[in-house]
Amino acid sequence: MLEDALNQYFGFKTFRQGQKEVIESVLAQQDTLAILPTGNGKSLCYQLPGYLVDGIVIIISPLVSLMEDQVYGLQKQGEKRAIAFNSQLDLADRQYVMQHLQKYKFLFLSPEMIVQEAVLHQLEQVKIAMLVVDEAHCVSQWGIDFRPEYLQLGEVKKRLKAPVTLALTATATAQVEADIRQVLLAKNANVYRYSMNRSNIGLFVEQTTDKDASLEDYLSRLGGAGIIYCSTRSKVEEVYNKLRQRYLVGYYHGGLASDQRKTLQQQFSQNKLKLLVATNAFGMGINKEDIRFVIHYDLPDSLENYSQEIGRAGRDGKQSNAILLYQEHDEQIHYFFQRENKEERLALERTVQEKRKEPLTPLQEKWQQKMKELGTSFWLETLKRNEQQKQEQLQKMLAYIHFTGCRRQFLLAHFGEEAQENPYCCDNDGIEIAGEEQLPEKKEAHHWQERLIKIFKDIN
């Protein structure tokens, strides 16, 4: 029985919603698309079958930090045959891995890495048990994080003799689902879509003129562990420095070294830190069940990203909170990035049309490489469509903030779902913050006279 294997390899007695059906489908050699809400344990859907079949499990992942988190999680469980094959490995280590592929059970690669001819050639020589495409929405030009390299994975699959393929994502509209199926999966693929509604998470938006005061107010009322999301690394450090004197807090962003990130994850998981101020680089691959709240200090750029980030709260099923702090003109930083992106794209178009040789920015150089690989007109059209989409996503995010009806209904409708009865719903439905014990503050050393007075007060 699958439950026996689950207990043997992971120490769990029961599956979460959707896990067993997806695993059974994969073990029956059926291509499978699993759309599971954040926090539902998507990684188990390939890890458990990986132990039950012969051969290597290849996992395509878009982010180095996500790969490292997944490998670290497997290693903590005692699995030594997992490795992230990416640019962080030096040349000698990469050569060693390629020459000893049969030693590994779980091999994590970026889409850019697996399409390299030398890598593909080596993979063709070994038995591939399963091809897993994590964050599969990246394959769609209508997805939040379109990555053109994902479009090449269909050809990669053919080269690897079409192993059974599992596509995983937490957010997919009907259009994104259709694109995933077309590029990655066989026509008879099984699709398992589960509601992204997290009924135990209350949804709150506060429109404020003083975010720091609002943040302090919430932290004084909330208990348990929490994440505070900010949009930039500098803002993360600024907010962290305001909180560090009073709370057990750390900060996390993509600029930290790999060992620093691992240490922070460990401290947060073990409750040595109760708060983490972070960019959205933090959260993917995090298995902490008892995060009681997620606060967005800055405005997210899309409902898709917002949904994924708040989904890191309350994975144990207990009441939790998602709080978004909004100050007038918060959207300006997103408009700025959108304008900057468009100007760089237009400048590159002019350079191409006029066949001029001019120095390019790092971003333009990256785009130029994509134009060589995928065709100039295709790539420029993709960039234009991406600009339009980001504008639309931001408008939807702003509409959510100003919405006066049920926020949960608004969020679910965006993903094509109908609202369900929800006793702990949102601020517009009149609920109040569900708090636990207050956050522990840092203990300051008191003067001996103050300590003595406190002792006498306590006795009396």
Regions found by a protein language model. Name each.
Residues 223-229, 233-236, 247-250, 254-257, ...:
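C-terminal helicase lobe
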Residues 2-9, 13-45, 49-55, 60, ...:
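Helicase motor core with emphasis on the C-terminal RecA-like subdomain
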